Amino acid sequence: SFNRRKELNMEFTPEITENVKNMMQLTDDALKEMNLLIKGPREQQNMNETFRIENEINSLRNRLKAENINNVDNRKYDYALGTMYIDIISECEKLGDYVVNVVEARLKKNG
């Protein structure tokens, strides 16, 4: 999406840029938490923080998708830009899902 945006010479609005930064910060937080859980002893770990971050990511994604529909409808920016924007948001959300999968696998108890 970033490459496509550059190829088409499209600029994100300041609001979109800020929203993407916020989502990327949450995914970065999720990755950092995952790394902490992977390094520590399994018996001393829990998934509470991982789930909290994942819930924040999902909530932000849902809010941004709804806002995007309104912004495109109100011609704040065009459909192509809105699609690229939401593609990036969706990819970040998928990364959050993958983090949860890794943490669940790491903390799964045998037997």
Model feature map: region roles:
Residues 1-111:
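Cytosolic, long alpha-helical scaffolding segments
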